[in-house]
Amino acid sequence: MTAVRAPRRRASGDVQGGFDFSRPDEIVCGVDEAGRGPLAGPVVAAAVILDPAQPIDGLDDSKVLSAKKRDALYDLIVTRSHAYCVASASVDEIDTLNILHATMLAMKRAVEGLSVLPTLAQIDGNRCPTLSVRAEAIVSGDALVPSISAASILAKVTRDRMLVDLHERFPVYGFNVHAGYGTAKHLAALREHGPCEAHRRSFAPVRAALDLIR
């Protein structure tokens, strides 16, 4: 599937929230993920259909927002959206399928878990999961399409909270600080303690740490 390179501006005109008023039968959801790159924890995806009657100011790519701003927007999104769903693929699924296919699986679960069936799913990035509804990939969609921005925020906040919970179980790795990414301190902890069950053994730094303790 060819990815859509959207113009560097927010959608406007007849498209508001998840509804295209030039086509009353069109219901659009935005989809994004968080956690493809980390060495530990699940990959999380979210799908959001915004409600044009309850606009949300400040939506943007979750990566450019502060944690405080993301948390505030998270509360608004789950309260004001027409529908939303957050789903994940586990570490075992990542290691079995690979991270790309696990990400597609999490996205598929998020779209299929919506309480309202969309007619179009707009996916951040350059490829789409196999869905029962039409889908289009939008490069940099998390910075361009409000519903994708909302999905990126839900996915990021949810995953960060999951990693805080993992920190309670495995405090030596500092998951609450780096969310599983391969920081210098995380890599040092991997070398010292070896991987835990939350680490992705299909990722090279984790395999290298395993080799050290064999």
From Swiss-Prot:
Gene3D superfamilies: Ribonuclease H-like superfamily/Ribonuclease H (3.30.420.10)
Note describing how the cofactor binds: Manganese or magnesium. Binds 1 divalent metal ion per monomer in the absence of substrate. May bind a second metal ion after substrate binding.
Cellular compartment(s): Cytoplasm
Reactions mediated catalytically: Endonucleolytic cleavage to 5'-phosphomonoester
The entry's keywords: Cytoplasm, Endonuclease, Hydrolase, Manganese, Metal-binding, Nuclease
Function noted in UniProt: Endonuclease that specifically degrades the RNA of RNA-DNA hybrids.
PANTHER family: RIBONUCLEASE H2 SUBUNIT A (PTHR10954), RIBONUCLEASE HII (PTHR10954:SF18)
Protein name: Ribonuclease HII
Native organism taxonomy: Bacteria, Pseudomonadati, Pseudomonadota, Betaproteobacteria, Burkholderiales
Annotated gene: rnhB
